[in-house]
């Protein structure tokens, strides 16, 4: 879990740095005549957004583009959520192993790693599954950033009060992006039977990273991130409802208690008849 936290933080920091670099880097316009592959990809995304705007607003195009991307990537995000849940379910056993092998010597650490790998393999845990959506979205976000900064018909677009090619100085979108990120993380962790410091740090740390990123990004990118995380909240609620998981877990526990009570009563009754 700690490794995942460190890697997620590193990816977030990398994205923030790349955003800053993009802001201060090359700002020449990208057009249909641009020759290099990256510029063609950026312009392709821009054309999709313009098509999806239906001549209403570029903001509408970005919203529909986000929904389209998230729907296409739905299987990948579902794999991430399942992987995260498996990782969380494995934590009590991992904690027990750490208590069983507390030594700092090479032999103890090696044995601990071996036993942890066995647990992960048994429970079908692959840490890389949790990171695929982040890795896949990074080029999409960077291409969208470049499109809003360097494609003329996007960088001059507006949606409500937002100039999509400039930062949202009202901070409404960065705040919304952070709030929806927190809600999606909170929902994902709601059904945890046990929480640790790393889980709590991710729940509060990732929204902060998203907020900082959205503050310095063009309004269109902040809009993308807001809609993307709102989509994630709905996906979690309808496909991985934590309240349903908790209710099912409590029902299993209650059924076990009822079974034990019936066995106890049957045993007492049998003893009385002797």
From Swiss-Prot:
It is found in: Cell membrane. A lipid is attached at residue 21 (N-palmitoyl cysteine). It is a multi-pass membrane protein. GO terms for biological process: protein insertion into membrane; protein transport. InterPro entries: YidC/ALB3/OXA1/COX18, YidC/Oxa/ALB_C, YidC/YidC1/YidC2_Firmicutes, YidC_ALB_C. Residues 1-20 form the signal peptide. The chain crosses the membrane at residues 56-76, 128-148, 167-187, 205-225. Keywords: Cell membrane, Chaperone, Lipoprotein, Membrane, Palmitate, Protein transport, Signal, Transmembrane, Transmembrane helix, Transport. The keyword Plastid does not apply. It holds the Pfam family 60KD_IMP. CDD domains: 5TM_YidC_Alb3 (cd20070). A lipid is attached at residue 21 (S-diacylglycerol cysteine). Its main location: membrane. One of its GO terms (cellular component) is plasma membrane. The keyword Transit peptide does not apply. GO terms for molecular function: membrane insertase activity. Required for the insertion and/or proper folding and/or complex formation of integral membrane proteins into the membrane. Involved in integration of membrane proteins that insert both dependently and independently of the Sec translocase complex, as well as at least some lipoproteins. Belongs to the OXA1/ALB3/YidC family. Type 2 subfamily. This is Membrane protein insertase YidC 2. It comes from Streptococcus pneumoniae serotype 4 (strain ATCC BAA-334 / TIGR4).
